[in-house]
Amino acid sequence: MISRRVLGRGPERILGLCLGLMAGPVWAGDNDVIGQALELPAHRALIAKRQRPDTELRRFETDGCSGGLSEVWRLVADQFEGFARTYESIPPWESCCVTHDQAYHNGVNAPDARVSFAARLLADRTLEACVTDMGITRRDELAEVYGITPDQVETAYATIGGAMYWAVRFGGGPCTGLPWRWGFGYPDCSVLAGDDK
């Protein structure tokens, strides 16, 4: 269901969001000409918005892992002591998400759209690698905690890292109106409103 908040921003926001979500999987590669063609206008719009004299970067805030993952994890851990004791009170990879949010906050202040595109791709790949590496470095410890083999821990964390990568590639582009978008520290922008000109 589309929230009233999104609907209240006008039809161009909804269209932009839909186009961005449909195009998400296409721009997974840094050499993907079609993906860049779809996403670069939004990066240009973000940079144009950022360069306006009245645009201010908001203070950095993080929700941990977006999409409600950290919030739900904490809720479950608060309600079920055994869950927190076994699986920790925050997602074990939350530090990876916070680092990712720091890059997304200001879009690394990229000077142009291609640099912004590449920086976002790097941030997303770094998130995936961070989660995957955590499964490798903590494999023996977590295998004992979870009651599975170390190889299963590595596979699980690689799967989680991959899913997180695709989620942020799919829904994290600039100018989507989403709170976890690339450049979320700046006011939202819109390709359809001419911010990319």
Kindly label every feature range from the protein language model.
Residues 27-197:
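Extended terminal accessory/targeting regions
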